Amino acid sequence: MSQFWGEFPEAVINTFQRLQIALIGDIKKCPLSSPLFPELSKLDAHSQHHLLASFELPRFGGVTPGVMEQLHDAESELAEARARLLRERLHAVANKENIPYLGDCMYYDAPGINQEELLQAAFLEAPTPEWESGRIRPLWPKDDWFRDAKQGPYPEDYGDIPLGDFDNLYRAFDALVEEHWMSVYSTTLNPFALLRCGSEFVEECVVSAGSLIPACMMTDHHLQPTGDRQADKEERQDYADSQDSIQSMGDFWKEFYSKDSGKKIPDSHKSRLANDPNKVGFTKSALFHKQPLAHSLAQTWANFRGTQDKADLVKVTMDMNIEKYTVRLPDAVRTTAGPLYIEWINLPRMSENSARKLAEAGWNNADICGVDLAVKSHIAVGTPVRVIISLVDGACSDMPTATMCAFEVNLAAQNNRSLNLPLLSLPFSRLLADLHDFQHRVKIACQFRDPEGFNVGTPMLSFSSLEFSELKQTAFERNSLLRDSWSEIEKRACHGGGRCVASQGIVQTWEKEVNPPLKEYAPLVLPPVPQPKRNFIDQQSGEVVRPLIQKSRSMRFKSPSDLWSRPSVDGGSTFTLSPSRGSLRCDNVPGCAYEVDPLHLLYYELVNVPKDTLGGTLLTRIDVRAKAATFDSAVWRQWVRDGCLKPKIKMRITAATSCFSGIVLGACLDAYRRIPATTKTDFTASLVTGLPNIVWATRDTSEIEWDIDLAAVCGHTFFALEDTFGYMDFLVYVLRGNEVTAVADWSIYVSFHVDWTQESMSATLIPTFVWPPEPADISYFKEVWGPYHFTLDGTEAKESFSLMPGMAIPRGAQTVRTFPRVLAAHFRSWTGKVRMSIQEVSSIFLTGTYMVGVSWNATADLTDITTRKHWIVKSGEVFELDLYCPYGENPTFTGLVNGIPYIIVHRLGGIIGPKDSVGTFGFMIHLHGLTGVYKNPTLHSGDRSVGSAWFRVTNILDDNLVFNIPGRIEDMVAVAGKYEVTNYANPTSMLFSVTGLHGGFIRLHITWCPNTSLGESKGTLKYMQYLYHTTTENFFGDQATRGIIDQNGFTVDLACGDFFGATRVGLKGEVERLGIYSSNAKSIAEIRVSFEILSMKFYGSTIRVK
């Protein structure tokens, strides 16, 4: 019995079981021995009766393949109807229990009622509202004949239906099961069923289906929840639209291929595929007629005399818009029907200058007539992966309408070529909006089918495009040169035995040879999308007016954010897109409030701030994963259900603007807990700048939204029920304290909202860094410095900062190493400019202007700076500072003799403020990266294969030496009383300490020397490689025994990483290791271990505090 039937009352199940048997034949004459039953028995009961009733198989006929294919489509419809029924029943239960509705989701805020109880209540018979009684109950029959047929009690208010009036009885059944159940049940009660089953079964169906009435009859009365959070009419309409927002690919193609093109060329939307890419292709002569010579001469003469009719002016162009574009496998979009792999690409056009010149020359329209696409596959021959490539009109949000032409290709073949006729006319104009349309309106969409097993970011295909267009000066178009039919075009596009095949027919040809059969595409999810709202300024009042725009109920599809965007061309008006799901603000409208959707809320917390708070104070450390488990929100349950996910978190912090306090707050993500839990004070920018962080001043900011993609930042997924590779620890702290004590303690509202992007079958995702370092890696250098201050009386008016990208950041008695600085430490020098800005953070009543310059020493004063290249800047202005030096290149680490480059910030104008101002004038410095590199930096060693020192073992006190080298690079710790270990620092080993995870292969170089004379030395040194190790079982790798006197030592390759492919410093788990043993260890003076990286991937950037 299908699971689908489990949600229906038993009476309905029994009814349709009997109905199904009756449809096959008389039970007495034809028991279950019919030849039809073996095939039907493979299907669920609901599909069986749907099959028999829909196709009216007479008696004992077999099930043909065509029928089976239609049956699978019917099963998909049943699954969609089941989901809709469940949502509607939940609405009914919530309405009855007065439970607030939280949006289009199966979760409700029901205090005292858990989700299991709520679902159970939804599957029970829901109450019939009073308003329904007048419409439904009069249709029920009450005749004795009907009552005797069922042999059971019935309500008295059935209404009047004459005996044997099957038409009214049929309409009553229609009213009961409503619109979306008609496709399932109406075919059951066709004339064939009535004749074969008799009236008893039909009437029994009507009575049994009565329990479905309350759940099925969902109108606006049901969809509107009770309580304080009443949905308005548009929101209820959006919900109703969303229930029909899933369109299967089969339905889409059926609608697309059956539509009338309404264009000059019939079936122009049906692209053509070439059987041989070298023998088929568009040319000007294939697409366009040639003008007669006499007509061309007449046009030339008329143009010379100035009597040329502009309606006759046509110019044919051919442009190679794309020489090569590589399409990589995108992240899947999570939908209710499965993952959707789709990549959107702008079809490049001519440059803006070229378009302007054509417009100035009088050409006003460009008709895109043909696009020739050559597709090159980048996957192995024979791999069963298909892709739908569509040319889409980006100005339309209805998928079947927006798709101008489409085709499907087999990537198992290395080369494919398609001929497409989009037939889209675009205007030439000097207006910015028209130019934007011309350059960005045409999109190419690539939807992959069954790409399982391929990693995100894998190059799947590349394509080149030729575009053929007609340029015209008017809209009359009476002299178009485009040919009139596909057949005429194909004759001239094919040569040397080439031929074209319709795109919808070629798939079945090669699909027959694929075993196992290919999976179907994921259905397109087409949610309703609000139209962009155009604001305008009232010329009399000067206020921003937001007109009401009727929402569209058409089917929508997801696409890039710039699909509908365009610059404003209306003078004096403002234009904004409708806020996206993650964006809340409408900053261009003064006093604009915003609504928060609680369905994405993972956790929130109120953080207390003391009224006399001091700089460096930690306000809170929030373990979001652990807190969310106790908070038990809807997105938490989704996380638990799906396992490993790649979350995008929006951290929303709401406080209040304080223009006088001078407080600077900050937040950071410590994904690997490198800041000790005991650290409660002394939080400075130097400590957190190497972590993902955000800084804001309360003088001008009361609320911030910090979007952070944890999968991109950390390079791995997160599991709901425990901490695996990293932590979701967010810290909130004070970087600069009060200038003026607040009136009382105050609070900050911190909330975390999650958008699950895709579940992942792999723990590690795209690495943050792949060995070896490249010259461009030094540009990763981005930091925040401060806070710094100038005194209000002018005694302190200069700050100087040394810029050594490869050095650790000093922090009192400690140092902090960051991932960008360790990367920079691999290079000896660097060149270029520093992109930076200054942010004022003190009281809003204090302002100033700064002069920023460069000095080769820290003693430069204002006079020295003004004689060199410098910048005069204000708060918030971004500029690029050229760090020129006497040697042409800047060192990345401290130069003991040559000097250090310094950035000098000098007060220039100000500081200006009220008489009673107190405190100091504070500011932060933001480094946005290194730009303008004019010479590639050089590595410390020209040969990257040279090993890096790891550690050495000395002062061995016991002859029996045993120590293990793990398959991860970390600081080695000595066994107390046995020997001493010295760890070495170098850029390569430090790289492992400032990243989250690492996985790859290293080669160990191990050498040793005796501490006695050669004649007295004796004993051996052995090693054993453990591939797998437990207390009861070992898998062994390489092994060897060497004498104490050995000049060469030995090398061993070791894998770094646990079973999931990576590991991290201090992570518990089973990794490969190398055991070192000796029974004559006192004879060894020292053992030295170096390593060489063969291949390595690093995931996530962090810091190391030492």
Curated annotation (Swiss-Prot):
GO cellular component: host cell plasmodesma; viral capsid
Record-linked Gene3D superfamilies: 2.60.120.20
Biased composition range(s): Basic and acidic residues: 224-239
PTM characteristics: Specific enzymatic cleavages in vivo by the P1 encoded 3C-like protease yield mature proteins.
A molecular function (GO) term: structural molecule activity
Chain residue ranges for the region called Disordered: 224-243
UniProt KW keywords: Capsid protein, Host cell junction, Transport, Viral movement protein, Virion
Pfam families the record matches: Nepo_coat (PF03391), Nepo_coat_C (PF03688), Nepo_coat_N (PF03689)
InterPro entries, per the entry: Nepo_coat (IPR005054), Nepo_coat_C (IPR005305), Nepo_coat_N (IPR005306), Viral_coat (IPR029053)
Family designation: Belongs to the nepoviruses RNA2 polyprotein family.
Note: Virions are comprised of 60 copies of the coat protein.
Name of the molecule in the record: RNA2 polyprotein
Organism: Raspberry ringspot virus (strain cherry)
